[in-house]
Amino acid sequence: MSNDGARNEDGLWNGAAAGDTTGAGSGAGTAGQRPAAVVLTALRGTPLSLAEVLDAISRPGVGGTALFVGTVRDNDAEPDGAHAVSGLDYSAHPDAARVLAEVAAEVAGGAPDGTVLAVVHRTGSLAVGELAIVAAAGSAHRGAAFETCRRLVDEVKARVPIWKREHYVDGSASWVGMTR
């Protein structure tokens, strides 16, 4: 999924493709300040772009930008890193794009006016070192940007129905975070 549309005068995307959600945000802003807004959300089966996400949140009123980049690491999440990882697969529920947009809108609803958010998550097969998620928040001040970006990533990981299967160099594989 891509967002090939042009931006309007507010910098929000026009003509967003399916799975991309733009323009969601919080309620009324204070005088002279626009409410927080989600400017890009997407699930993609193709490599992610840092530049796309950073460009999406670029605004004259943004003085601080926080960026989170999640990459595929070469070991599992166990404390001892017992398994060497060769890659992983991300699978998404059919509602995942909608839930991603809802989560981002909720986070924007709690962010200071003028804050902008963007998040793109990868699906499909990824090799070690590839980008799995790129999230960013821009705000007038760095503290709000850091806090909003952290909350966005935490909420995406907790609530968006995306599942990860790790593949190990020994040929085995396992689902991560699945409970029976």
Describe each region flagged by the PLM.
Residues 132-139:
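Short glycine-rich or small-residue beta-strand-to-loop segments that form or flank ligand, phosphate
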